[in-house]
């Protein structure tokens, strides 16, 4: 009898838990649906207001600023702007300047909010290039304050907003600030990719070269990576840095530049370091071997064939890849393809097939 009561009790508890879970799931889905419809309604309302020129109606303007104190409403507004930008680019360009100046009024409010909410405001400024139209004396102090924030989201979005301002001196000031506070410096890729969104590249890069020696090596590497993707016009400066720098990471960044833009003056350095097997410097050797893929010649062929048998897997792989990219005749590679080094043979065959497949696919 007791056992039956215990089983019945557990059965009732289990049914209760199942019913509770079903009820909460229904409520959750209902709330999600209601919120989604509300957001869509707000989005359409904001889109219409933007097209009617928000700033012409002062009463409407004040109401919107108050609504945008809510981060969710701010992001809904950004979604509406995104739709206008994609569907009606001309109307967007006509109205974004006045809206950008309106958004300045949110800065004192968001300065008192959490880091994530501050980052959201900077994000909206960045994606619509609002900082181009805003008063620098109002928006820049806010962005530079975010730049010193411990939150990566704040720093990244502040940088993006500064890049979108198209103000070269503000960008240089931001880079100098990050260099002076190295613990705040974001990952090299974040910094380089962000700088690529800055439109005035050919005006910015000379200023970077002018101050390059004043930056820390880590910052220099990020800037050299940026220059590699941004312009082919700096071979002399890159060559000088390649030959004079003693920092391996900086040398690797320069080597990658010459792997992207051919310059025969870099070949002696590439050949020397591709062959040099110094302990702790295999990354530089690896970068040189990879760069040699665009410098055909008997010395290149000889070194690559030698390094395909390297003890280092990365060096071996890049040597095989460079040989394949050079479109070397298979007869010239017969000593490897028919040799006793099974690992070198398999690696080379794999890379030859991969390059052939890429060419077949038009890549």
Regions found by a protein language model. Give the residues of each.
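N-terminal signal-anchor transmembrane alpha helix of single-pass membrane proteins
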Residues: 1-39
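Short, Lys/Arg-enriched, disordered terminal segments
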Residues: 1-6, 275, 349-363
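N-terminal topogenic membrane-targeting module
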Residues: 23-113
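Short amphipathic alpha-helical segments that mediate assembly, nucleic-acid/protein binding
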Residues: 47, 61, 74, 235, ...
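Amphipathic alpha-helical scaffolding segments comprising HEAT/armadillo-like alpha-solenoid repeats
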Residues: 61-65, 97-111, 133-146, 168-179, ...
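Structural detector for internal amphipathic alpha-helices that build alpha-solenoid repeat scaffolds
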Residues: 79, 87-97, 119-132, 156-166, ...
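Structured extramembrane domains adjacent to transmembrane segments
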Residues: 105-130, 134-142, 151-160
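Short inter-helical turns and helix N-cap capping residues of alpha-solenoid HEAT/ARM repeat scaffolds
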Residues: 113-115, 150-152, 182-185, 215-216, ...
């Amino acid at each position: 009898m007791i056992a039956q009561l215990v089983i019945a009790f557990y059965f009732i508890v289990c049914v209760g838990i199942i019913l509770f879970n079903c009820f909460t799931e229904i409520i959750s889905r209902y709330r999600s649906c209601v919120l989604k419809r509300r957001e869509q309604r707000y989005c359409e309302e904001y889109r219409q207001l933007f097209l009617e020129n928000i700033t012409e109606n002062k009463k409407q303007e004040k109401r919107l600023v108050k609504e945008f104190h809510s981060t969710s409403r701010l992001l809904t507004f950004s979604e509406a702007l995104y739709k206008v930008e994609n569907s009606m680019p001309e109307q967007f360009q006509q109205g974004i300047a006045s809206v950008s100046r309106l958004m300045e009024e949110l800065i004192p409010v968001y300065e008192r909010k959490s880091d994530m909410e501050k980052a959201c405001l900077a994000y909206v400024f960045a994606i619509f290039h609002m900082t181009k139209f805003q008063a620098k004396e109002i928006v820049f102090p806010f962005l530079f304050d975010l730049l010193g924030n411990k939150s990566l989201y704040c720093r990244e979005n502040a940088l993006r907003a500064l890049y979108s301002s198209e103000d070269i001196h503000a960008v240089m000031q931001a880079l100098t600030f990050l260099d002076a506070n190295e613990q705040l410096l974001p990952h090299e890729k974040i910094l380089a990719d962000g700088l690529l969104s800055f439109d005035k590249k050919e005006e910015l890069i000379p200023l970077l070269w002018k101050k390059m020696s004043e930056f820390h090596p880590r910052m220099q590497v990020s800037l050299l990576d940026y220059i590699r993707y941004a312009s082919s016009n700096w071979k002399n400066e890159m060559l000088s840095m390649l030959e004079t720098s003693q920092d391996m990471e900086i040398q690797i960044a320069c080597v990658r530049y010459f792997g992207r833009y051919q310059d025969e003056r870099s070949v002696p350095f590439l050949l020397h370091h591709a062959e040099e097997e110094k302990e702790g410097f295999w990354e530089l050797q690896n970068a040189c071997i990879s760069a040699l893929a665009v410098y055909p010649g008997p010395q290149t062929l000889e070194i690559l064939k030698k390094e395909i048998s390297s003890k280092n897997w990365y060096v071996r792989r890049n040597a095989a890849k460079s040989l394949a990219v050079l479109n070397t005749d298979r007869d010239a590679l017969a000593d490897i393809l028919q040799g006793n080094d099974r690992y070198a043979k398999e690696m080379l065959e794999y890379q030859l097939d991969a390059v052939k497949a890429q060419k077949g696919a038009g890549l």
